[in-house]
């Protein structure tokens, strides 16, 4: 009896250790993914009629003196991550690799590409900041990012143009994916409105997509002066520089897409109050696109949402919020009602009415 119990305990212990090893080496997944994007494995496979052998890939990589065994080990891990598929060729000698659905998200020229997101979030300085999680747990307002870099993330991006470009490209890549889903799943949300301001709209990716889908809407891009200065011009989109903590341009509808999660509750209440002042009481609304956390849920997206919350803790001092959090926040800002609508994304759509 004793030996059976010991064996069972040992088996559980091994599984626990394996789980912990996987967590410990979580950074390896990020950096293997970065390497895969940097050397263009997904694009090479696509351009080789969708499949490739190890020897073919060795000859096509933008690297000199590739060790085929080292490359094989990298590919083996990508197969384990379900990024690549693997089959044995007809001759039974060489393995043939192809892209799994997840792997197609690494294609640099794809509309759905997450390659810019991977490169933006895995740059050295952004990984270095995670060494200061402990320091970011204090009762003050100083984030782990500030402890690591000596300034907040927004100032860092302002004074480091190369890193800012990588970050912006990553955000734009994420925005393209999210905006496409938003316009398909919530088309009725945008119908009937006459004017919209994208508050904190970055380089204008979202507002351009909205204008293309709904050309009758008068569209405005609003962000900090240095962000507006680096955004692309569009003949039918007004660009306004400013500070959302000071004022927001008036319109029937204001959009806050992945903005409020960057900020504390106090900052968010301030932003929302400025937004409420800028929309008409009878026909206006604020559209918030952000995570609505379900803390106890076993939904497949829950871990991704919780990771984003820790990301906010470390980098911006903001947070992802539950439905109850959103209700409290909007009440504090003076909104009379709101509704939360899930979409096919990590985020949800929250419509707030003055």
Curated annotation (Swiss-Prot):
Induction: Up-regulated upon fungal elicitor treatment or wounding.
EC number from the UniProt entry: 2.1.1.116
Tissues expressed in: Expressed in roots, stems, leaves and flowers. Restricted to sieve elements of the phloem adjacent or proximal to laticifers.
Gene Ontology MF, one: O-methyltransferase activity
Disulfide bonds: none
Domain of life: Eukaryota
Active site per UniProt: 261 (proton acceptor)
Pathway: Alkaloid biosynthesis; (S)-reticuline biosynthesis; (S)-reticuline from (S)-norcoclaurine: step 4/4
BP terms from Gene Ontology: alkaloid metabolic process; methylation
Keywords assigned: Alkaloid metabolism, Methyltransferase, S-adenosyl-L-methionine, Transferase
Presence of keyword Methyltransferase: yes
Cross-referenced Gene3D superfamilies: Vaccinia Virus protein VP39, Winged helix-like DNA-binding domain superfamily/Winged helix DNA-binding domain
Residues that coordinate or bind S-adenosyl-L-methionine: 223
Catalysis: reaction(s): (S)-3'-hydroxy-N-methylcoclaurine + S-adenosyl-L-methionine = (S)-reticuline + S-adenosyl-L-homocysteine + H(+)
Keyword hit for Mitochondrion: no
Task performed by this protein: Involved in the biosynthesis of benzylisoquinoline alkaloids. Catalyzes the transfer of the methyl group to the 4'-hydroxyl group of 3'-hydroxy-N-methylcoclaurine to form reticuline. Also involved in the papaverine biosynthesis.
Protein family membership: Belongs to the class I-like SAM-binding methyltransferase superfamily. Cation-independent O-methyltransferase family. COMT subfamily.
Protein name: 3'-hydroxy-N-methyl-(S)-coclaurine 4'-O-methyltransferase 1
Provenance organism: Papaver somniferum (Opium poppy)
């Amino acid at each position: 009896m004793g030996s059976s119990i010991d064996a069972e305990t040992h088996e559980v212990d091994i599984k626990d250790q394996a789980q912990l090893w996987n967590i410990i080496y979580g950074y390896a997944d990020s950096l293997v993914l970065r390497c895969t994007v940097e050397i263009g494995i997904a694009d090479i496979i696509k351009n080789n009629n969708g499949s490739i052998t190890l020897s073919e890939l060795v000859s096509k990589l933008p690297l000199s003196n590739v060790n085929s065994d080292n490359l094989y080990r990298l590919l083996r891990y990508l197969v384990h991550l379900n990024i690549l598929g693997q089959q044995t060729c007809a001759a039974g000698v060489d393995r043939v690799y192809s892209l799994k659905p997840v792997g197609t998200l690494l294609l640099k020229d794809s509309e759905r590409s997450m390659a810019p997101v991977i490169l933006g979030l895995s740059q050295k300085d952004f990984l270095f900041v995670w060494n200061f999680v402990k320091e970011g747990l204090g009762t003050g307002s100083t984030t782990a990012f500030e402890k690591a870099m000596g300034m907040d993330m927004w100032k860092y991006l302002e004074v480091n143009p190369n890193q800012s470009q990588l970050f912006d490209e990553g955000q734009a890549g994420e925005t393209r994916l999210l905006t496409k889903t938003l316009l398909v799943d919530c088309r009725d949300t945008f119908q009937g409105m006459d004017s919209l301001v994208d508050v904190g709209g970055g380089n204008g990716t979202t507002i351009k997509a909205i204008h293309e889908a709904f050309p009758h809407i008068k569209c405005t891009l609003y962000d900090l002066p240095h962000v507006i200065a680096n955004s692309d011009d569009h003949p039918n989109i007004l660009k306004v520089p400013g500070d959302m903590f000071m004022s927001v341009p008036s319109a029937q509808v204001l959009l806050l897409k992945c903005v409020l999660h960057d900020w504390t509750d106090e900052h968010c209440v301030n932003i929302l109050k400025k937004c409420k002042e800028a929309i008409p009481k009878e026909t206006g609304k604020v559209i918030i696109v952000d995570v609505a956390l379900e803390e106890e849920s076993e939904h497949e997206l829950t871990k991704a949402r919780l990771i984003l919350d820790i990301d906010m803790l470390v980098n911006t001092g903001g947070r992802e919020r539950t439905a109850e959090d959103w209700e409290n926040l909007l009440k504090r800002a003076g909104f009379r009602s709101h509704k939360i609508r899930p979409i096919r994304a990590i985020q949800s759509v929250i419509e707030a009415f003055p």
